[in-house]
Amino acid sequence: MTHLKDLPLHTLQFYATAPYPCSYLPGRQARSQVATPSHLIHNNAYSELVTQGFRRSGMFTYRPYCDGCQACVPLRVPVSTFQPDRSQRRAWKRHQKLLVSSLKLCFLPEHYQLYLRYQNSRHAGGGMDHDSIDQYTQFLLQSRVNSRLVEFRECLPNGEAGALKMISILDVLEDGISAVYTFYEPEDQAGYGNYSVLWQIEQARQLGLPFVYLGYWIAQSPKMNYKLGFRPNEILQNGQWIASSTAKAISHE
């Protein structure tokens, strides 16, 4: 892990939180390293922080800082070398007719209702399935960086936009796109999540940005392990981005 003294952002301060229950690995305690003050973390600073393994949740910019555990590994996909596998190509082809709109962060009841359906289906009992409007807004719709809310809608026979199928929140950084959060209609075998990542990779390519940052890969968490399937990819290890295929074994203890 990069030490505080090595961070180039001298105007910011960094502190460690108290331990709290890990959201990904049952029975574990987690801690975060938090960057403050939030009003100084605009797009340039945040882009630099992301390359150091930070993420954001609303105005909260953090990275894992756990005692004796390195299970959360930052992962990014180099756009120029990405090669989709067979299932990813199927997901891309299947959803080509979705109508896509990129919006500023905004609250719409339709979005919130989709969020609740997604949480109740995919993460029931995790707490987020009962998020209030205020919690949803603080989590996804507050940002000081270059953020976008992307709608994916069914295309009706007349070419007009129909039912809302998916929402992706993303940040456009200096060197890439950072995938913040995606939620979608909980349809079996639809592959919306894979399509969202593929769409962001293509969007980064069109914008001339070299990377898509997918957050943390956690080998022991099935909900997070899928990220390794977007290959080739790079992970942040000992302060350096390296190809995951050549990385040394990572300790999860």
Curated annotation (Swiss-Prot):
Record's GO cellular component terms: cytoplasm
Subcellular location: Cytoplasm
Record field: catalytic activity: N-terminal L-glutamyl-[protein] + L-leucyl-tRNA(Leu) = N-terminal L-leucyl-L-glutamyl-[protein] + tRNA(Leu) + H(+); N-terminal L-aspartyl-[protein] + L-leucyl-tRNA(Leu) = N-terminal L-leucyl-L-aspartyl-[protein] + tRNA(Leu) + H(+)
EC number(s) reported in the record: 2.3.2.29
UniProt keyword terms in alphabetical order: Acyltransferase, Cytoplasm, Transferase
Enzyme superclass (EC): transferase
A GO MF term: leucyl-tRNA--protein transferase activity
InterPro entries reported in the protein's UniProt record: Acyl_CoA_acyltransferase, Asp_Glu_LeuTrfase, N-end_Aminoacyl_Trfase, N-end_Aminoacyl_Trfase_C, N-end_Aminoacyl_Trfase_N
Alphabetized Pfam families for the sequence: ATE_C, ATE_N
Biological process, per Gene Ontology: ubiquitin-dependent protein catabolic process via the N-end rule pathway
Family: Belongs to the R-transferase family. Bpt subfamily.
Protein function: Functions in the N-end rule pathway of protein degradation where it conjugates Leu from its aminoacyl-tRNA to the N-termini of proteins containing an N-terminal aspartate or glutamate.
PANTHER family: ARGININE-TRNA-PROTEIN TRANSFERASE 1, ARGINYL-TRNA--PROTEIN TRANSFERASE 1
The name this protein goes by in its record: Aspartate/glutamate leucyltransferase
Origin species: Polaromonas naphthalenivorans (strain CJ2)
